[in-house]
């Protein structure tokens, strides 16, 4: 007999209370962490189905277990929708995360110890792009490229010269904290000139790529990886795309059996839902609003000389602000804003002088507030509230004013109706 407790709240009150408290936090906080979003009820419902019961090692039509005819349907739906959404010939939807998608791509493309050119973490890259504390930096010989010191934007000529010098087997393009358009065609040209593979990690911009608001890397990269959350607004998970059949086979083998065992078919179902949502014209409207909101918010900081907007602006869903003109560090800013129910993260800026545990900057993204229905006016208001709080960080009465103004905004834009 199945052990079941219908009344979850009564059966496990301690856990229920923690979940409920998080629900309240999300409801009454302004979420500006660039890697976070608000998924649909359909995505949550798919992820909560009994598909979680099913083991399905292998791939559709080639499983190591029986009873997989319906999870094959689910996974094939996710695969075909991902291919349609991004214009790719092959898709792997089994990677549990973006980091595992990147690990699988590396396994398919290069060998341990090979030289890889990736974006330096302090310049806007990701841990999996060669950080020495990450598996990528421990397994491969990563060399970091940065941004131009004056413009704080990618300098493709400098990257080409660096590539000629280090002769990488692989070049990784993509970022976790870069606010400008990335020219994937130029990266392809650089890779071709030095005889390297090109891998693009589009985790942060996938929703913008899907809607044509950022140039797609799929036609230029040997392999494209992504998460399925962030701007794509799906469940937490990974995705790998390629147009090369030989690489597709290597990628599949790298994911299973190379890195993972059984796929999370309930999460794959949620991915399928989110891909369907992203194919809807309404998602393009959403993505356009994300870009508009981000630009509007960034402009408020650009017009205030107490702050410095990194690279002078933004073309996507994210931007960085140097805050040390008004408060000790990015960490201090993050902690202070937590107190007034505005959530964002400290972030290193290019050519950072403080430790990564303190930082000079903060990172701000608008994907989540846009999902709640907020627009340009609210984005500008939120930027002004951030400035008000940071400038008056030692004034408790003003901080209380900010907290109340935040509550007024969140009350106007409920997280979910009748959750």
From Swiss-Prot:
It holds the Pfam family SHMT. Keywords: Amino-acid biosynthesis, Cytoplasm, One-carbon metabolism, Pyridoxal phosphate, Transferase. GO terms for biological process: glycine biosynthetic process from serine; tetrahydrofolate interconversion. Its EC number is 2.1.2.1. Signal peptide: none annotated. The modification N6-(pyridoxal phosphate)lysine is found at residue 230. It catalyses: (6R)-5,10-methylene-5,6,7,8-tetrahydrofolate + glycine + H2O = (6S)-5,6,7,8-tetrahydrofolate + L-serine. Pathway: One-carbon metabolism; tetrahydrofolate interconversion; Amino-acid biosynthesis; glycine biosynthesis; glycine from L-serine: step 1/1. Its cofactor is pyridoxal 5'-phosphate. PROSITE patterns: SHMT. It is found in: Cytoplasm. It comes from the Bacteria. The record marks 229 as: Plays an important role in substrate specificity. GO terms for cellular component: cytosol. InterPro entries: PyrdxlP-dep_Trfase, PyrdxlP-dep_Trfase_major, PyrdxlP-dep_Trfase_small, Ser_HO-MeTrfase, Ser_HO-MeTrfase-like, Ser_HO-MeTrfase_PLP_BS, SHMT-like_dom. It is an enzyme of class 2 (transferase). Homodimer. Belongs to the SHMT family. NCBIfam families: PRK00011.1. PANTHER family: SERINE HYDROXYMETHYLTRANSFERASE, SERINE HYDROXYMETHYLTRANSFERASE 1. This is Serine hydroxymethyltransferase.
